[in-house]
């Protein structure tokens, strides 16, 4: 079983907007995950609690690692791997999610898998096998070295509204 962890706990302080930027794009991210092969979805909130069933991360100010640990801790015991996506990545393609999961299912192992796009950009989705969950770095999945890159060069990267003109 593979579960998705959607990180939506930040304060959106760079934007100073209401609603928070990650909540604006959350519906698109959730729709992409619904269209993928993930078995379960957990949304991690923090600075701005969500009016949906989500995991609240009281330590969200400690950074993405804290949010990731909250999300991973909420997953069922049957979950073998987590596919992590960002709530402020509005153009998530479910084919990228499926491709990363299928690559892991075919080869197994305890390596981090990262989508690798045409631009050479390594970006989410990121698959983290259960064996690595206890060693989650404070900076979240950015702190891990990817063990394997999954070719998503035919797909558009999901973007990040902090940095992508498409998200503004």
What does each model-found stretch correspond to?
Residues 1-45, 97-100:
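N-terminal glycine-rich phosphate-binding loop and ensuing alpha1 helix
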Residues 51-60, 148:
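Active-site regions of enzymes building and remodeling cell-envelope glycoconjugates
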Residues 7-9, 44, 85-87, 115-117, ...:
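Short beta-strand segments
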Residues 10-13, 47-48, 60, 87-90:
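Short glycine-rich anion-binding loops that position phosphate/pyrophosphate groups of nucleotides
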Residues 61-130, 134-135:
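Conserved beta-loop-beta/alpha segment of the NTase-like Rossmann-fold superfamily
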Residues 133-168:
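Conserved alpha/beta core of the MobA/IspD/sugar-nucleotide pyrophosphorylase nucleotidyltransferase superfamily
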Residues 39-47, 115, 136:
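Short, hydrophobic beta-strand segments that form beta-sheet elements in well-ordered domains
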